[in-house]
């Protein structure tokens, strides 16, 4: 049997890291087993679903490298199939119209609360007589549709992460609403637990892999699978991603969407790498820095943890820095060029641009670091106080004057590391200065500060765009 898994996001917000991690585990499992990774957009929440969020979700998955194997299914396009399934359940007596009003439900919950009982529907309209139903209709009452759940029903499955799971019908809060309130002669909008089962059956999903917050839904859905005569998939409930306090990571914790992580300067490789480690233990001998292609060869649910996974910013930053350092300069240039364009900076040529990336790459943690670390090369820097103090040291400006003369008389067409070192050495000998004084003063003049990238290679880059001499001259 060919394995099919799916991600079923709702387009009511940006792609959340929790949803992305679920997508990643689905993708890894599918690739490990030569299966298919499918997408279903669950857009039945008409008020909150937006096209821009759908695009954000798909773009985020694509950025992470989680390619899907068929055109995404749009759930709202299948509402008639969902209603047909509800009709079937009504005809079989497995579902019924419930006329209980919102006020009556609220009173029911209050009464249960007063007795310290958990809220649940008391199934009061499960077996209405024809006369009772007629009376409700004559009152003009609307109705939801509920699926019958026997309190004594045993619900069991072998979870691929958590092992044997045992529930009973009484754990599920009474008969389940499967269609929203509507005039009694109509079927209202079908609800989540029903439509998920219908669509997973239609798509031939063999394994449902999702967060542990869906465990109660799984118990309900198993009953619907059986009632509708659909093949039951296997289930795997992955751990939640937690914040520093051990609570479920939410928008209140700040950045949680994949597009936000991307905007902050995290690479797709580091994000995929880190998300895999959020809840999955690597095999012995495997380095914790890996690609999704590498992890897809060894991924299995035996190594998925049951306990929640705490989000660790420092670990993510470390992985991101390692990914940047190990990436080719061509890759990094492609990633940061849009950032440079946003600043209004023009790259003179490919060779120069790659030299720049080679220069700044070792000190980058985020891709966005490239902007401040490159600003020296596109804008005349203001001298900070350290640079000003350096240039006021006795002999500093005189050493730069001699260096300028050495540059003018050398007639070098293209500055190299060897040329630069010789010019500094000659200036030191000619003027009787220490090379350290010349180097620090040169850095102050060229970069406006005493910290930053290698001064020799910075000088070479600036000389290639005719910015070195003018920066030295302005400090004299």
Swiss-Prot record:
ATP binds at residue 251. Keywords: Aminoacyl-tRNA synthetase, ATP-binding, Cytoplasm, Ligase, Nucleotide-binding, Protein biosynthesis. A motif ('KMSKS' region) lies at residues 248-252. GO terms for biological process: glutamyl-tRNA aminoacylation. This is Glutamate--tRNA ligase. Residues 109-129 have a biased composition (Basic and acidic residues). Belongs to the class-I aminoacyl-tRNA synthetase family. Glutamate--tRNA ligase type 1 subfamily. GO terms for cellular component: cytosol. The gene is gltX. Coiled coil: none annotated. It is found in: Cytoplasm. Catalyzes the attachment of glutamate to tRNA(Glu) in a two-step reaction: glutamate is first activated by ATP to form Glu-AMP and then transferred to the acceptor end of tRNA(Glu). It comes from Prochlorococcus marinus (strain MIT 9211).
């Amino acid at each position: 049997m060919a394995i099919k898994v799916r991600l079923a996001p709702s387009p009511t917000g940006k792609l959340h890291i929790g949803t992305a991690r679920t997508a990643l585990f689905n993708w890894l499992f599918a690739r490990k087993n030569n299966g298919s990774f499918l997408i279903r957009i669950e857009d039945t929440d008409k008020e909150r679903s937006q096209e821009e969020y759908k695009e954000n979700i798909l773009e985020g998955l694509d950025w992470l490298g989680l390619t899907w194997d068929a055109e995404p299914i749009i759930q709202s396009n299948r509402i008639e199939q969902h209603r047909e399934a509800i009709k079937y359940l009504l005809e079989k007596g497995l579902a019924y119209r419930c006329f209980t009003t919102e006020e009556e439900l609220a009173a029911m919950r209050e009464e249960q609360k007063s007795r310290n009982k958990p809220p649940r529907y008391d199934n009061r309209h499960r077996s209405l007589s024809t006369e009772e139903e007629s009376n409700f209709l004559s009152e003009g009452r609307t109705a939801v549709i509920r699926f019958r759940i026997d309190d004594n029903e045993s619900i069991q499955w072998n979870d691929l992460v958590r092992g044997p799971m045992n529930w009973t019908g009484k754990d599920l809060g009474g008969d389940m609403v499967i269609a929203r309130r509507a005039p009694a002669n109509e079927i209202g909008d079908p609800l989540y637990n029903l439509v998920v089962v219908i669509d997973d059956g239609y798509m031939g999903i063999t394994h449902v892999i999702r967060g542990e917050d869906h465990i109660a839904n799984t118990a309900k859905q198993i009953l619907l699978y059986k009632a509708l005569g659909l093949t039951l998939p296997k289930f795997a409930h992955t751990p939640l991603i937690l914040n520093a306090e051990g609570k479920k990571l939410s928008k209140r914790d700040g950045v949680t969407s994949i597009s936000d992580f991307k905007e902050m300067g995290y690479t797709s490789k580091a994000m995929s790498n880190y998300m895999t480690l959020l809840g999955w233990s690597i095999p012995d001998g495997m380095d914790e820095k890996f690609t999704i292609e590498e992890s897809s060869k060894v991924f299995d649910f035996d190594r998925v943890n049951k306990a929640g996974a705490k989000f660790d910013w420092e670990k993510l930053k470390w992985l991101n820095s390692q990914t940047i350092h190990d990436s080719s300069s061509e890759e990094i240039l492609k990633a940061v060029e849009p950032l440079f364009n946003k600043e209004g900076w023009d790259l003179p040529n490919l060779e120069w641009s790659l030299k720049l990336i080679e220069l700044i790459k070792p000190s980058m943690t985020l891709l966005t670091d490239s902007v401040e670390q490159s600003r020296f090369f596109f804008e005349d820097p203001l001298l900070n106080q350290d640079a000003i103090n350096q240039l006021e040291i006795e002999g500093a400006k005189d050493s730069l004057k001699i260096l300028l003369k050495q540059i003018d008389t050398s007639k070098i067409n293209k500055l190299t590391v060897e040329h630069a070192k010789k010019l500094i050495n000659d200036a030191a000998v000619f003027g009787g200065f220490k090379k350290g004084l010349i180097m620090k003063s040169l850095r102050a003049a060229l970069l406006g500060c005493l910290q930053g990238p290698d001064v020799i290679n910075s000088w070479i880059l600036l000389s290639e765009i005719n910015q070195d001499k003018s920066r030295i001259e302005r400090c004299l």
